C-alpha cells in the first residue's frame, strides 16, 4: 500500500471512530462512508448501497464487502477519471475499507459466482431472521389497536429499516446476477412492493402511497388528488411515458411530457397543488362521498388567487388573457392552467424575481398548450422540444429552452456589477428585467424566445474593457444614480410643502404688524413662483435621473417626462415674470396684478382639483369614471405616471380621515413651535444685522460686508432652518408614542403584568381561553343560571386543562421551572366525578391550613364563612377537600365504614344548614383530624402492600377515635354511640378492616392531590420564580383577553409554512466550544451557568444529576448531548430556532387530537404526539423549511454544522432542509459545474434522505445572498401563508397555540383590501445580559410594539422589517417573492417585501396578541456593525425605485408617514448631527470674522430664544429622548407606572444617553457615506455571548472615521469658539449653548471604552497600548489584513471612494477645514490690524515650512542608509533652526506664545484637509509619487488622535473604583438578579471541570 493510501486509511479509520463514538451527539453517520460526493449523488443507489452495507456489516462482513465493491464499481462507471470534487478521496477511502474486509476474509481468490450465491443465501437468512412475513402485519395490528406506544414506533422503524436493506440487496442481486431463481425473483419483487414507504416523499406519498401515512386517508386530500387525474379532454400520452405503478396518470404528467419539466419539480408541484386544493376544500366543507370530489368554489378560489397577478397584467397591457371567458372554463381546465403556472414558477429559479416575466411565459405556453389540446395524442411543445422526444424522466427541456436564456443574460449583468462596486446605472438588475414586461414592447421577444433581441444582449465584461465602462443595454424606467438628490426627487411634495410653509410663516413673522397691506399680500403671493420653481426643479431632476434609461423606456413615459419639463419650465418663467411685474405695479387694481391673481387661482385650482381627484380615497371612483374623457385622462397621466405597480394605493375614507387627523395635529404642533420659538424671535435681530453697514471685520472679507452681512444672517438662521426640517420627526415621535400608548391600552395590553394578577384572574382563564383559542363547543351553553354557570365553568376548565398543562410541561422541558413548581402549576383534568372545578395547586397551597386556623379562631359559623369567602381560592380549596375526601373515603371503605362516613357528612350538612356547626363540632381540634387524614392519604397514595394496608387501617381507626372523642360534641357523640351497627362492628374489630385500595387512575390522582393540599404549607405566591417563565405566562394569559379572531378547527384552518434562511452560523454548540476559555479565562458554559443558575440546576435535575454536579461528571453521551442542547437553547443558534418553530406542529397535533375526540375524552391529551391522524393533520397544515445554502458543501467538507443539522432532522421528523448542491462533473474533457436545489429529510438510519432534486440554470447567487437563499428554497414551502423567521429567533408552545387565530386575520376586515402581511410582535430575549443589550432590547421592543402598532393603524403604512411577519404566501410568490435580491440596492432585502406589497395593492397589519422571540446583538461593536448595516441599507433605499414610487404615488399624509418611518428617520438623524456642525461653524464664523464681538457690543442679539429652542430640540434628539419617549410609554403600558420610572432612571444611570448619542454618529456616518459612495454590504455581526474585553486597536479601527475624527472636529470648533467668540461675561451663555456639542464629542470619543468590559483595568490598558503601537507601526504588504497593520487598514478605509463624483464631493466637503487657518491667522498679534490677503498667503509659507520639517524628520531610512550621519546632522540642524526662529520671533516681533498655540490650532485642520483631499485623489497622488508622504502624514494624525483618546482612558485606569463603577454600570441587570459578573470578568473560574 502506498504511503498516500496508508495515510488516507488512517484518516478514514479516525473518521469512522469519530462517527461511532459521536453517534448520539452527531447523528448516525454511516460508518462505511459519511458522504457521497455531489458529482456521484445523482445516482442515488450508491448512497443506499453503502447504508445497507453499514446496516449488515456486523451480521456478515462479507456481504458488506460485496455491497461496497458494487458501490465502488458504480462510482467508477460514473466518474472513471475521478475528476469530480471529492470523488478521488471517496473512492480511495471506500477502497481502503474494501481492502480491510478482504484482509479479514479467508485466503483465496474471489469467486464472483460464489459471492452471488452468498448474497442470495444472505437474502433468505435476513428475511427469516427479521420475520419479514409477519413484520408488517404486527405493526398493522398494533396501529389498529390504537395503542400509541413506543412499541409501535419501534416496529415501524424496524420495518422500514429491514425493507430498505432488502430493497438494496435485491437490486444489487439483479444487477450482478445474470439469472435469479424464479422463486427468489418473486420474493424480491414482493418485498420491493412492501418497501413502498421507503421511497422518499415530503408530506403526502403521492408517488408511493403507504398505509402508515394517514394524510392519504383524508377525504379532502383524496378529492384533490382525484381532481388532478387525467380528464377526457387531454390528449393521450405515449405508451412508453413512465408513470409510477402506484398511481394513475394526471394532468401534471401531461404537462411534464409536453414541456419537458423536471421529474422532481413536477412531483414537488404536484404535492404543492394538492395541498393548496385540499386545504381550500377543508375550509369549505369535508367531502363525505365514497369518492370525494372537490367543490368548484375551492378550485375557483385557488385559481383566481394564484393567477390574479396574471389577470391584472393582461388587464394593464390591454391584452386578452389566455382564456376568452373565465366563466366558461370548467374546473379541469382551471386546474390545468393552475398546474402549468406552478410548474413554470417551480422551475424558474432566479427568474422567480421577475413575476411579470413569468406572466409572459405562462401567457405564451398556455396558447401553445391550447394547440396541443386540439390533438388526439400529446406531442412535445415546439418551445421546449426535448432532445429525447419521449420526454425524459429527468428532462430539462423547459429549463434549457425557456429559463436558461433569461438566466444567461441576468447572470451576465449581475457578473458585471463587479461584486457590488459598479454603479447601479451600469448594469440591469432584477427590477429592470421585470419592468421590461410592463409594456407591449416585450412581445417583440416572441415565442419561442427571439434571442437575437437586444433584450438578450449580454454586456461586455467590465474587466475586458480598458476604460472600465461596459457597453450595456440601458436600464428600464428608472436609474439608481448615487446622489442625495433622490431625497428631493422622491419626496418633493414634502420639501415643497415645508419650504412654502417656512416662507409663509417668515412673511407673517416679518409683517406681523401689517398683515393686510398690499406689500404683505404681494409677499404672500410669492408662494406661487416658489411652488412652480420647485416643481420645475423636480421635473429637471426627472430628466437627469432618467439618464441611462431613455433608450429602453417606453416612448410614452419619456414623452411625459419632457412634457412635464416643458410645462413646469414655461409655468415657472411665466408666473415668475408676472410676479415680478406685479411687484412693480402701482396698486392692487393693476391689470398685471389681476392677471397674476387669475393665473395663480386657475393654476392652484387645477392642482387642488387633481390632488383631490387622485389622492383622496372617496374620489377615486369618480376619477376612474372620468377616464373616458381624453382631457381628464391626459391630465391624470401628466400628473402621475401609470406604472404596473403603484396603482390604486388608497385607503377607505374612514382610515384616510384617521391618519389625516393625526397629521393635522402633528403639523399644527410643528408649525406653532416653528413660528413662535424659531422664526418670530429671529425677526428683530435679522433686521438689525441687515441694517448694520459699518461692522468691522477682523479678516479679509469677500462676501458679507457689502451684502447686508449675508453670512452673519446665514449663520443665525442656518441651525434654525436645519431644526425646522427635522423637528417634524420629533413631533411625529411624541404624538405617535402617545397614540400607541392609548391604542395599546384599548387593546388591553399589560393588564396582567405580575404573578399577583395571574393568581387573581386565574379562574377567568378557562372561559377566556374557550372564547379566544378553542373552537366552539356544542355542550357549552350561554345560560347564566347558577347551576348552568357551574357546569359551564367545569366544561371550560376541563378543556383548558390539557393546554395549560402542556404549556407548563414545556416550561419544565426548557428548564425554566423545577419539578415541584411543575407539580404546583399543573391543572387537574376536571373530567372526573367531582362537579366543582379543580384549580392548580399553586392557587390552593396552604389555603387549607389557613382555613383551619380561621375555623379555630372564629366564634361563629357566619364569621368562618365570611373570612373564608374573602379569598376565593381558600373557598375553592375547602370545598374541594370537603367533597374529595368524602369521595375518597366512600370509594375506599366498605360496609359500616362507608355508612359512618356518609353519616358524618350528613350531620355536617345538617349543622351547616341549621348554623350549629360550633355546637355540634369542636373546630378548635380540626388539626387532629387533618393530621390523621394526612397520614391516611400518605399511605393510600402508595402502591398496595400488606404493610401499607395495615397502616391504612390503623390510620382510619385513629381518625375514627379523633372524630368520636375529640371533634364531636357530647350531644353529637351520643348519636353514634347508640348506633348499634357501628358500635357492634367496632367492638368486634370489623370496622375498617376491609379496604378497597384506590387503583383507579382518577381516584389515585385525587388521593395524591388531597395529600398535597394538606401537606404543602408554604405559599406559592412566587411560583414560578424564574423571570422568563413569569413573563411568558403573563403574556399568554393577558392575550386571552385581547381581541383575537375566533379560531377554526385545525382541519379548517389556513395552512402555513415557516421559512428560515441559514448560512454558516452556530447550529449547536460542541463541547469544545462550550468549554474553551477566552483570554479572560471564561468559557461559554461557565458564563451560562452564572447567568442562568436556576435553569442550570433545573437541567441537572431533569437529567437525574445532583444540583452540585459539574459538567465533567456528565460522562454518558445522552447527558453530553442534552448539555449541548441546553447551552444552545440559551444562545442565538439554529437549534433554538428549530425547537421553537416545531412547537407549531406540536400545538397543532394537540389541538387536532383533542378536536377529533368526543365527549369527556376530548380533555385527555395523553398520547397525542403518537396519534397518526394528529400528526398527519399537523403535517397538512404546517411545514418547516430551513434553507441551509451551503449544507452540501458542509457535508462534503465534513463540517460539524452538517452533522448538527442532520441531528436536528433526526429529532424533528417534520423538519425539512433545503440546500444548493454544487456538482462538479466531467463533460467533454472539462470540469462542468451544475447546481441543484435539493430538499432532504431524516431517514430511518439517521442520515438525510433526498426528497427532491431540481436542477438550476446556473449559480443561484446572482444578487444578495439571503434573498437568493430564500428564493431557491421557496418552491419547497407549502400552504396559504409563510412566516419568515431568522435563525436567531425563538418561539414558545403557548404562542404556537394562537397561530390559527392569527391566520384568520387574513379573512378579517382590515380596510379596503385584505391583509397580505400580518405583523407579529417580538420579544427580545437577549435584554438581560448587559446594559447595552437592554438598551437595544428596549429600543427594539418599543419599535416592534408601540411603533408598529401606530404604523399599522391608523397610519396604514407599516412595512415588513425583517421580523417574524406572516405573508400571504400565494400573493407573494406570484409577485416576486418575499424579498428582493438585486445586488447592493436590496441589501436590506426584507423591507422591500413590504414596499412591493404596498405597491401591488397589498395591506400590512400588526397584531400583538402573539409574539415570537428574537435575539439581538449584545456588544457595542456588534451593535455598531448592525446599525451600520441598517443605515447603509437605508442609504441604498433612498436610491431605489420602490421608495421613489411610494414617495410619488402615496397620498400626501401616508407619504409623510412612510418617509419619517423609513429613510426620513435616518435623514433626520443626519440632520441632527449636521445641526451641530452648522451651529458651530456659524459660531466659528462669528468669532473669527470679528462680527460676533461687534454684535455683542451693540446688543443686537439680546434674545437667544430661537437659537436656544433649536439647540434644545437638537440636544433632545441627540441624547435619544425621542427614542426614550416611546420606550417609557411602552414601559408604563406593560410594566406599570412605578416600574417604568424605575427602569428609565436605571437606564440613565447606565449612561443610555451616551449610547444613544454614539448610535447617532453610527447611523449618520453609514447613511451619508452609502449615499455618497456606496459600499453598503451585509455585516455578519456575530451572535455570541459578549463579555470579553475588546482591544483598543480594534475599537480604533472600527470607530476612527465614523466617530473619532468627527468628534475631534467638533472639539476644534468648540475650542475656537471658546478662544475667539466668548467673553468673560458670556461663560454661562457658552456653557448653555455648547453643552450638547461637548456631550456629543465626548460620547463619540469614549463610549467604546465606557462600554468595553474591563475597559479601565490597568493591566488590560497596558496590553492594549502595546498592541496598538505594534499595529500602528507594522508596515503592510500583500496579504496583510487591516487588523494586523495600520497601513493595510488605512488602504481599506479609502476603498469606498471610487467614482469621480465621489472624489469631487469629498474635496468640496474637505474645504471646510481651511476655514480654521483663514480665520485664526488674522487673530494673531503678529499681524496687528492688517486684514489684507497677504497675511493668509504668508500663513501658507509657514505651513509649507512645517511640511518641509516633517519631511526631513520622516525621511525614509531605507533611502538614507548610505548617508545616515548627514541625515542626522541635517535633522538636528533643522530642529535647532526652527526653535531659534520661534524664539527670535517671540522676542523681536509681536508674536506671542499664545500665537504659537493658535498656529497649531490653525494648521492641524489644514493638514487634515489636505490629507482628506489627497485621499480622495489617491490615483493622481500615486502617479505623482507623493503617496508615501501622504501616508506618513496620515499615520502621524492617527497616532496623535489615538494618544489623545488613550490618555484619559489610561488616567482613569489608575483608579480602581472607575473599573468597579464601569462593571456595575454595564452589568447592572445581571447584578440585580444575583449574578457574578465580577467573577466572570476576573476569570476566577472555580469550575474544575473546565
Swiss-Prot record:
GO cellular component term, pick one: plasma membrane
Keyword Phosphoprotein: no
Keyword Protein transport tagged: no
Intracellular or extracellular location(s): Cell membrane
Entry's EC annotation: 2.4.1.34
Result of knocking out the encoding gene: Plants develop deformed or collapsed and inviable pollen grains.
Record field: transmembrane: 490-510, 524-544, 561-581, 592-612, 659-679, 723-743, 1458-1478, 1513-1533, 1540-1560, 1610-1630, 1631-1651, 1704-1724, 1733-1753, 1769-1789, 1796-1816, 1839-1859
SMART domains in alphabetical order: FKS1_dom1 (SM01205)
GO biological process: (1->3)-beta-D-glucan biosynthetic process; callose deposition in cell wall; developmental growth; generative cell mitosis; microsporogenesis; pollen development; pollen germination; regulation of cell shape
Membrane-side (Cytoplasmic) residue stretches: 1-489, 545-560, 613-658, 744-1457, 1534-1539, 1725-1732, 1790-1795, 1860-1890
Domain of life (superkingdom): Eukaryota
Membrane topology, from the record: Multi-pass membrane protein
Reaction(s) this enzyme catalyzes, per UniProt: [(1->3)-beta-D-glucosyl](n) + UDP-alpha-D-glucose = [(1->3)-beta-D-glucosyl](n+1) + UDP + H(+)
Record keywords, A-Z: Cell membrane, Cell shape, Cell wall biogenesis/degradation, Glycosyltransferase, Membrane, Transferase, Transmembrane, Transmembrane helix
GO molecular function (one): 1,3-beta-D-glucan synthase activity
Residue intervals on the Extracellular side: 511-523, 582-591, 680-722, 1479-1512, 1561-1609, 1652-1703, 1754-1768, 1817-1838
UniProt main location, coarse: membrane
Homology family: Belongs to the glycosyltransferase 48 family.
Known function: Involved in sporophytic and gametophytic development. Required for normal plant development. During pollen formation, required for the entry of microspores into mitosis and microspore symmetric division. May be required for correct temporal and spatial control of callose deposition during pollen mitosis. During plant growth and development, callose is found as a transitory component of the cell plate in dividing cells, is a major component of pollen mother cell walls and pollen tubes, and is found as a structural component of plasmodesmatal canals.
Descriptive protein name: Callose synthase 9
Taxon lineage: Eukaryota, Viridiplantae, Streptophyta, Embryophyta, Tracheophyta
This protein's encoding gene: CALS9
Amino acid at each position: 500500500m502506498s504511503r498516500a493510501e496508508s495515510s488516507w486509511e488512517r484518516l478514514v479509520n479516525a473518521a469512522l471512530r469519530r462517527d461511532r463514538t459521536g453517534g448520539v451527539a452527531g447523528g448516525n453517520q454511516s460508518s462505511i462512508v459519511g458522504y457521497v460526493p455531489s458529482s456521484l449523488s445523482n445516482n442515488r443507489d450508491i448512497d443506499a448501497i453503502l447504508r445497507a452495507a453499514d446496516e449488515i456489516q456486523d451480521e456478515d462482513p462479507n456481504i458488506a464487502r460485496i455491497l461496497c465493491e458494487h458501490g465502488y464499481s458504480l462510482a467508477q462507471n460514473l466518474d472513471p477519471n475521478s475528476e469530480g470534487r471529492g470523488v478521488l478521496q471517496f473512492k480511495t477511502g471506500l477502497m481502503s475499507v474494501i481492502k480491510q474486509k478482504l484482509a479479514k476474509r479467508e485466503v483465496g481468490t474471489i469467486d464472483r459466482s460464489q459471492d452471488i450465491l452468498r448474497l442470495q443465501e444472505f437474502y433468505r437468512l435476513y428475511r427469516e431472521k427479521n420475520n419479514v412475513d409477519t413484520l408488517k402485519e404486527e405493526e398493522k395490528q398494533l396501529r389498529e389497536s390504537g395503542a400509541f406506544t413506543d412499541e409501535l414506533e419501534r416496529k415501524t422503524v424496524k420495518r422500514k429499516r429491514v425493507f430498505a436493506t432488502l430493497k438494496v440487496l435485491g437490486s444489487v442481486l439483479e444487477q450482478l446476477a445474470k439469472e435469479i431463481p424464479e422463486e427468489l425473483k418473486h420474493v424480491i419483487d414482493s418485498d420491493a412492493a412492501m418497501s413502498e414507504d421507503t421511497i422518499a416523499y415530503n408530506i403526502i406519498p403521492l408517488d408511493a402511497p403507504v398505509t402508515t401515512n394517514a394524510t392519504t386517508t383524508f377525504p379532502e386530500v383524496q378529492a384533490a388528488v382525484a381532481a388532478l387525474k387525467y380528464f377526457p379532454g387531454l390528449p393521450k400520452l405515449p405508451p412508453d411515458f413512465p408513470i409510477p405503478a402506484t398511481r394513475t396518470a394526471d394532468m401534471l404528467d401531461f404537462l411534464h411530457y409536453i414541456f419537458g419539466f423536471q421529474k422532481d419539480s413536477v412531483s414537488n408541484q404536484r404535492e404543492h397543488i394538492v395541498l393548496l386544493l385540499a386545504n381550500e376544500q377543508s375550509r369549505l366543507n369535508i367531502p363525505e362521498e365514497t369518492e370525494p370530489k372537490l367543490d368548484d368554489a375551492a378550485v375557483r378560489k385557488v385559481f383566481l388567487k394564484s393567477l390574479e397577478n396574471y389577470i391584472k397584467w393582461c388587464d394593464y397591457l390591454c391584452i386578452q388573457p389566455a382564456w376568452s371567458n373565465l366563466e366558461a372554463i370548467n374546473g379541469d381546465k382551471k386546474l390545468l392552467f393552475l398546474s402549468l403556472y406552478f410548474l413554470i414558477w417551480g422551475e424558474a429559479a432566479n427568474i422567480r424575481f421577475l413575476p411579470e416575466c413569468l406572466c409572459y411565459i405562462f401567457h405564451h405556453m398556455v396558447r401553445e398548450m391550447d394547440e396541443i389540446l386540439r390533438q388526439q395524442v400529446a406531442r412535445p411543445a415546439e418551445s421546449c422540444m426535448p432532445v429525447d422526444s419521449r420526454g425524459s424522466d429527468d428532462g430539462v427541456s423547459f429549463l434549457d429552452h425557456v429559463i436558461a436564456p433569461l438566466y444567461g443574460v441576468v447572470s451576465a449583468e449581475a457578473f458585471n456589477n463587479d461584486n457590488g462596486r459598479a454603479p447601479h446605472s451600469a448594469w440591469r438588475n432584477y427590477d429592470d428585467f421585470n419592468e421590461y414586461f410592463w409594456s407591449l414592447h416585450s412581445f417583440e421577444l416572441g415565442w419561442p424566445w427571439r434571442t437575437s433581441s437586444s433584450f438578450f444582449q449580454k454586456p461586455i465584461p467590465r474587466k475586458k474593457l480598458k476604460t472600465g465602462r461596459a457597453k450595456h443595454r440601458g436600464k428600464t424606467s428608472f436609474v439608481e444614480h448615487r446622489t442625495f438628490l433622490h431625497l428631493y426627487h422622491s419626496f418633493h411634495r414634502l420639501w415643497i410643502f415645508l419650504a412654502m410653509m417656512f416662507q409663509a410663516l417668515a412673511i407673517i413673522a416679518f409683517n406681523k404688524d401689517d398683515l393686510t397691506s398690499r406689500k404683505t399680500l404681494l409677499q404672500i403671493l410669492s408662494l406661487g413662483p416658489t411652488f412652480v420653481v420647485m416643481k420645475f426643479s423636480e421635473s429637471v431632476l426627472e430628466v437627469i435621473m432618467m439618464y441611462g434609461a431613455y433608450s429602453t423606456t417606453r416612448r410614452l413615459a419619456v414623452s411625459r417626462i419632457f412634457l412635464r419639463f416643458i410645462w413646469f419650465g414655461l409655468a415657472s418663467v411665466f408666473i415668475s415674470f408676472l410676479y415680478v411685474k406685479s411687484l412693480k405695479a402701482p396698486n392692487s387694481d393693476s391689470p398685471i396684478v389681476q392677471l397674476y391673481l387669475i393665473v395663480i387661482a386657475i393654476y392652484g385650482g387645477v392642482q387642488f382639483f387633481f390632488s383631490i381627484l387622485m389622492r383622496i380615497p372617496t374620489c377615486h371612483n369618480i376619477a376612474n369614471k372620468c377616464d373616458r374623457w381624453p382631457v381628464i385622462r391626459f391630465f391624470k397621466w401628466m400628473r402621475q405616471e401609470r406604472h404596473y405597480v403603484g396603482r390604486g394605493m388608497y385607503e377607505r375614507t374612514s382610515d384616510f380621515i384617521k391618519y389625516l387627523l393625526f397629521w393635522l395635529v402633528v403639523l399644527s404642533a410643528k408649525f406653532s413651535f416653528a413660528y413662535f420659538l424659531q422664526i418670530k424671535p429671529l425677526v428683530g435681530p435679522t433686521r438689525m444685522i441687515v441694517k448694520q453697514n459699518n461692522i468691522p471685520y477682523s479678516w479679509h472679507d469677500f462676501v458679507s460686508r457689502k451684502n447686508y452681512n449675508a453670512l452673519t444672517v446665514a449663520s443665525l438662521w442656518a441651525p434654525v432652518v436645519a431644526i425646522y426640517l427635522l423637528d417634524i420627526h420629533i413631533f411625529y415621535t411624541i404624538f405617535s408614542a402617545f397614540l400607541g400608548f392609548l391604542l395599546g391600552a384599548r387593546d388591553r395590553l399589560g393588564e396582567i403584568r405580575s404573578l399577583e394578577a395571574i393568581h387573581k384572574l386565574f379562574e377567568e382563564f378557562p372561559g377566556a381561553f374557550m372564547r379566544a383559542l378553542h373552537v366552539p363547543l356544542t355542550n357549552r351553553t350561554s345560560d347564566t343560571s347558577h347551576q348552568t354557570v357551574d357546569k359551564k365553568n367545569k366544561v371550560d376548565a376541563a378543556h383548558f386543562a390539557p393546554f395549560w398543562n402542556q404549556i407548563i410541561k414545556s416550561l419544565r422541558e426548557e428548564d425554566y421551572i423545577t419539578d415541584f413548581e411543575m407539580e404546583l402549576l399543573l391543572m387537574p383534568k376536571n373530567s372526573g366525578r367531582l362537579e366543582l372545578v379543580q384549580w392548580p395547586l399553586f392557587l390552593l397551597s396552604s389555603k387549607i391550613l389557613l382555613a383551619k386556623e380561621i375555623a379555630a379562631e372564629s366564634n361563629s359559623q357566619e364569621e368562618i364563612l365570611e373570612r373564608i369567602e374573602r379569598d376565593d381560592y381558600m373557598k375553592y380549596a375547602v370545598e374541594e377537600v370537603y367533597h374529595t375526601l368524602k369521595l375518597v373515603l366512600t370509594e375506599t371503605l366498605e360496609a359500616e365504614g362507608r355508612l359512618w362516613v356518609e353519616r358524618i357528612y350528613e350531620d355536617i350538612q345538617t349543622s351547616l344548614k341549621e348554623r350549629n356547626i360550633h355546637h355540634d363540632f369542636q373546630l378548635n381540634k380540626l388539626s387532629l383530624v387533618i393530621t390523621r387524614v394526612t397520614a391516611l392519604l400518605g399511605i393510600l397514595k402508595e402502591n398496595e402492600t400488606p404493610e401499607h394496608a395495615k397502616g391504612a387501617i390503623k390510620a382510619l381507626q385513629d381518625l375514627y377515635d379523633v372524630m368520636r372523642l375529640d371533634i364531636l360534641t357530647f350531644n353529637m357523640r351520643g348519636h353514634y354511640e347508640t348506633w348499634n351497627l357501628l358500635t357492634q362492628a367496632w367492638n368486634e374489630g370489623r370496622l375498617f378492616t376491609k379496604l378497597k385500595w384506590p387503583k383507579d387512575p382518577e381516584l389515585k390522582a385525587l388521593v395524591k392531590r388531597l395529600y398535597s393540599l394538606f401537606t404543602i404549607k408554604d405559599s406559592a405566591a412566587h411560583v414560578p420564580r424564574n423571570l422568563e417563565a413569569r413573563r411568558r405566562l403573563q403574556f399568554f394569559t393577558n392575550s386571552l383577553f385581547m381581541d383575537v379572531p375566533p379560531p377554526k378547527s385545525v382541519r379548517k384552518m389556513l395552512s402555513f409554512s415557516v421559512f428560515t434562511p441559514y448560512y454558516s452560523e452556530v447550529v449547536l454548540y460542541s463541547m469544545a466550544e462550550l468549554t474553551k476559555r477566552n483570554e479572560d479565562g471564561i468559557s461559554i458554559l461557565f458564563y451560562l451557568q452564572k447567568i442562568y443558575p436556576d435553569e442550570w440546576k433545573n437541567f441537572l435535575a431533569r437529567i437525574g444529576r445532583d444540583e452540585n454536579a459539574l459538567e465533567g461528571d456528565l460522562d454518558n453521551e445522552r447527558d453530553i448531548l442534552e448539555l449541548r442542547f441546553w447551552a444552545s437553547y440559551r444562545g442565538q443558534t439554529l437549534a433554538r430556532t428549530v425547537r421553537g418553530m416545531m412547537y407549531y406542529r406540536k400545538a397543532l397535533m394537540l389541538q387536532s387530537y383533542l378536536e377529533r375526540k368526543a365527549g369527556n375524552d376530548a380533555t385527555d391529551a395523553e398520547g397525542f404526539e403518537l396519534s397518526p391522524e394528529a400528526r398527519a393533520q399537523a403535517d397538512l397544515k404546517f411545514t418547516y423549511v430551513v434553507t441551509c445554502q451551503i449544507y452540501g458543501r458542509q457535508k462534503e467538507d465534513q463540517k460539524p454544522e452538517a452533522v448538527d443539522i442532520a441531528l436536528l432532522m433526526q429529532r424533528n421528523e417534520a423538519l425539512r432542509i433545503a440546500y444548493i448542491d454544487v456538482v462538479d462533473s466531467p463533460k467533454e474533457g472539462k470540469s462542468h459545474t451544475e447546481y441543484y436545489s435539493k430538499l432532504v429529510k431524516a431517514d430511518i438510519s439517521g442520515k438525510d434522505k433526498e426528497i427532491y432534486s431540481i436542477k438550476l440554470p446556473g449559480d443561484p447567487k446572482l444578487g444578495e445572498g439571503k434573498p437568493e437563499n430564500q428564493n431557491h428554497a421557496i418552491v419547497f414551502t407549502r400552504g396559504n401563508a409563510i412566516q419568515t423567521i431568522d435563525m436567531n429567533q425563538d418561539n414558545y408552545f403557548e404562542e404556537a397555540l394562537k397561530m390559527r387565530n392569527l391566520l384568520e386575520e387574513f379573512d378579517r376586515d382590515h380596510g379596503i383590501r385584505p391583509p397580505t402581511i400580518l405583523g407579529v410582535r417580538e420579544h427580545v430575549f437577549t435584554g438581560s445580559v448587559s446594559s447595552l443589550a437592554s438598551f437595544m432590547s428596549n429600543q427594539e421592543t418599543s419599535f416592534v410594539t408601540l411603533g408598529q402598532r401606530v404604523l399599522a393603524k391608523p397610519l396604514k403604512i407599516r412595512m415588513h422589517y425583517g421580523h417574524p411577519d406572516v405573508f400571504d404566501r400565494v400573493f407573494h410568490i406570484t409577485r416576486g417573492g418575499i424579498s428582493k435580491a438585486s445586488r447592493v440596492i436590496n441589501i436590506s432585502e426584507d423591507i422591500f417585501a413590504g414596499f412591493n406589497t404596498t405597491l401591488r395593492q397589498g395591506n400590512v397589519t400588526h397584531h400583538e396578541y402573539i409574539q415570537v422571540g428574537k435575539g439581538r446583538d449584545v456588544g457595542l461593536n456588534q451593535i455598531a456593525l448592525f446599525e451600520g448595516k441598517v443605515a447603509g441599507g437605508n442609504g441604498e433605499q433612498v436610491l431605489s425605485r420602490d421608495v421613489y414610487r411610494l414617495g410619488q404615488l402615496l397620498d400626501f399624509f401616508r407619504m409623510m408617514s412612510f418617509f419619517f418611518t423609513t429613510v426620513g428617520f435616518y435623514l433626520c438623524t443626519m440632520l441632527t448631527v449636521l445641526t451641530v456642525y452648522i451651529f458651530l461653524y456659524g459660531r466659528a464664523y462669528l468669532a473669527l470674522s470679528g462680527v460676533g464681538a461687534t454684535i455683542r457690543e451693540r446688543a443686537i442679539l439680546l434674545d437667544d430664544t430661537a437659537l436656544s429652542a433649536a439647540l434644545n430640540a437638537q440636544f433632545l434628539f441627540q441624547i435619544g429622548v425621542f427614542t426614550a419617549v416611546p420606550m417609557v410609554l411602552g414601559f408604563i403600558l406593560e410594566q406599570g407606572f412605578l416600574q417604568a420610572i424605575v427602569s428609565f432612571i436605571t437606564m440613565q444611570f447606565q449612561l443610555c444617553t451616551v449610547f444613544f448619542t454614539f448610535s447617532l454618529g453610527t447611523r449618520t456616518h453609514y447613511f451619508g457615506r452609502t449615499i455618497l459612495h456606496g459600499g453598503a454590504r451585509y455585516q455578519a455581526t456575530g451572535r455570541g455571548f459578549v463579555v470579553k474585553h475588546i482591544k483598543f486597536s480594534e475599537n480604533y479601527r472600527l470607530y476612527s472615521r465614523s466617530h473619532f475624527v468627527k468628534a475631534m472636529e467638533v472639539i476644534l470648533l468648540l475650542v475656537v469658539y471658546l478662544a475667539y467668540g466668548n467673553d468673560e461675561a458670556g461663560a454661562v451663555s457658552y456653557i448653555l449653548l455648547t453643552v450638547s456639542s461637548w456631550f456629543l464629542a465626548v460620547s463619540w470619543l469614549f463610549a467604546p471604552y465606557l462600554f468595553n468590559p474591563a475597559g479601565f483595568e490597568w493591566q488590560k490598558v497596558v496590553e492594549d497600548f502595546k498592541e496598538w503601537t505594534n499595529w500602528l507601526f507594522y508596515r503592510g504588504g500583500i496579504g496583510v489584513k487591516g487588523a494586523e497593520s495600520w497601513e493595510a487598514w488605512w488602504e481599506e478605509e479609502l476603498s469606498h471612494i471610487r467614482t469621480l463624483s465621489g472624489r469631487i464631493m469629498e474635496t468640496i466637503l474637505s474645504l471646510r477645514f481651511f476655514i480654521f487657518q483663514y480665520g485664526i491667522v488674522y487673530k494673531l498679534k503678529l499681524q496687528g490690524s492688517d486684514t489684507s490677503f497677504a497675511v493668509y498667503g504668508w500663513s501658507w509659507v509657514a505651513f509649507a515650512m512645517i511640511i518641509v520639517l516633517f519631511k526631513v524628520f520622516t525621511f525614509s531610512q531605507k533611502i538614507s542608509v548610505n548617508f545616515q550621519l548627514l541625515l542626522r546632522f541635517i535633522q538636528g540642524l533643522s530642529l535647532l533652526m526652527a526653535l531659534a526662529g520661534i524664539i527670535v520671533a517671540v522676542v523681536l516681533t509681536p508674536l506671542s506664545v499664545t500665537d504659537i498655540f493658535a498656529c497649531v490650532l490653525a494648521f492641524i485642520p489644514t493638514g487634515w484637509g489636505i490629507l482628506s483631499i489627497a485621499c480622495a485623489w489617491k490615483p493622481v497622488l500615486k502617479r505623482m509619487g507623493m503617496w508615501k508622504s501622504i501616508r506618513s502624514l496620515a499615520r502621524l494624525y492617527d497616532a496623535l488622535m489615538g494618544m489623545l483618546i488613550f490618555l484619559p482612558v489610561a488616567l482613569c485606569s489608575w483608579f480602581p473604583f472607575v473599573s468597579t463603577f464601569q462593571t456595575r454600570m454595564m452589568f447592572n441587570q445581571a447584578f440585580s438578579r444575583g449574578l457574578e459578573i465580577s467573577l466572570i470578568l476576573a476569570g476566577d473560574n472555580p469550575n474544575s471541570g473546565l
